[in-house]
Amino acid sequence: MNLIINDKTASSSVGQTIGKAARLNHAHVGYVCGGHGLCQACYITVQEGADCLAPLTDVEKAFLSPRQIAAGGRIACQATIAKEGTVKVLSRPEEVRRMVFSNPFQLIGYAADMGKDTAQQIVPGVQNLIGRIQRGEMGGKDALGDMIESIQGAAGLVVEAIQQGPMALPIPFKEQIADLISKLPLPQIQLPSISLPQLPSISFPQLPFSLPKLPFSLPFLPQQPQATASLEKVTITVQPPAKD
C-alpha cells in the first residue's frame, strides 16, 4: 500500500484508517476525539486514490457538507483503506500552511467556507451524535479510553519533539518561521556611557603647634682609624757556594 500524506510516504496496510496510519507515522494530521469523528481535527482532502478507500461512513455524511465531499474531503479517522493502490491526501493544517506562504488572502475565503460548512452540518451532526449515544456507541469506558489514548499520543509526540530540540516540534510551518526570524534585522543596542563622579580632594589640617628642639646635642663620635697595609719591595740575592 502506497499512502502519501502531505507529500511524504507513510507505511500503511489495507483495513487501516488513514488517521491510524498518520498517527503511527507521526504525520501532521490532527486527532483529539479518539477516532469518533467529533472534532474533525483530522479532516483531509483526498487528492488521488479515492477509489482505494471505503465509502463514506454515516459519521462523514453527517459532519461533512456536500461541498466538502465534492472536493474530496474525508475524516481521516473514518476513512478506511479498502484495497491496494496509491492514496495521496492533504491535511487541513498543511493546506493552511501552503496558503499562508503562497497567497494569504485565500485564507479569508477558506475561513468563510469552513464556517458555512460547519453551520450547515450542525443539525445532521447533532442527530448523528444523539443516535450513536442511544445505541451505546459513544458511552462507556471504551469511548473515554479512546479519547485518553489520543490525547496521550499527542502529548507523547510533543514530549519526544521537545527532547530532540525546539525545532523538532510538530509545527506545520516551523521551517518558514525560523527562516523569517533569521532574516529579521536585529536592533543595535548602544549602551550609555557611564562616568563615575569625581571624588573630592581631602586635605589634612595643619597642626597648631611645632615640635620643640632638643636641649642637648649628641656627642661627637670619633672616627675609627682605618687599617692600611703596604707591600715594600724586597730584593733577594742568591750567591753560589764558595769553592774549596
From Swiss-Prot:
Matches recorded under Gene3D superfamilies: 3.10.20.30
Pfam families, A to Z: Fer2
GO biological process annotation, one example: photosynthesis
Domain 2Fe-2S ferredoxin-type stretches: 1-95
GO CC list: chlorosome
Superkingdom of this protein's organism: Bacteria
UniProt-recorded name of the protein: Chlorosome protein I
Protein source organism: Chlorobaculum tepidum (strain ATCC 49652 / DSM 12025 / NBRC 103806 / TLS)
Gene for this chain: csmI
